[in-house]
């Protein structure tokens, strides 16, 4: 999913400078061919970033790659699209003040078409607005929903999955 979200950013956001990292570097190569810069490590990927977007396999990966190594620089907005539980979202929001949970609802087809559902959750109105503007690249405008907490975004995502 992360590849498709990054591809939408490259195609929809004029002038974006996008740095990507993947544990399996070959998986990031198509994005490099489309204009992204490949980082050798997560630390290199976030260096000088204005916004950091993660799309990982699950909450344990979020802890390992982002939270435990304290990857997010102070003041930098972190938008995480990983599917996590409400308790995980609360944990990440407590660990990183700039955390915005923005899980996506849908499969690769809607992702390629920019028609995903997205819940964007944070109590910070400015960060929520920023994240929603970015998520417009991969979201269906009628399914882009801002909520006031990371946990509420996680709940919305889980309920949407039940309806599928």
Q: What residue spans do the PLM features occupy?
A:
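NAD(P)+-binding Rossmann beta1-loop-alpha1 motif at the extreme N-terminus of oxidoreductases
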Residues: 1-54, 81-82, 91, 108-111, ...
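Short, hinge-like loop/turn segments at secondary-structure boundaries
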Residues: 35-39, 55, 72, 116-121, ...
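Glycine/threonine-rich flexible loop motifs
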Residues: 56-68
């Amino acid at each position: 999913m992360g590849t498709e979200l990054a591809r939408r950013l490259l195609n929809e956001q004029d002038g974006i400078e996008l740095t990507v990292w993947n544990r399996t570097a070959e998986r990031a190569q198509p994005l490099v061919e489309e204009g992204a810069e490949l980082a050798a490590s997560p630390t290199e990927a976030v260096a000088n970033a204005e916004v950091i977007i993660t799309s990982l396999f699950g909450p344990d990966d979020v802890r390992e790659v982002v939270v435990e190594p304290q990857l997010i620089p102070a003041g930098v907005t972190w938008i995480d699209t990983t599917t996590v539980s409400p308790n995980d979202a609360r944990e990440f929001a407590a660990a990183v003040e700039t955390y915005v949970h923005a899980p996506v609802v849908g499969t690769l087809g809607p992702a390629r078409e920019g028609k995903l559902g997205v819940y964007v959750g944070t109590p910070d109105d400015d960060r929520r607005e920023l994240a929603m503007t970015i998520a417009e690249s991969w979201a269906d405008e009628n399914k882009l929903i801002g909520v006031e907490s990371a946990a509420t975004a996680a709940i919305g995502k889980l309920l949407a999955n039940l309806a599928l």
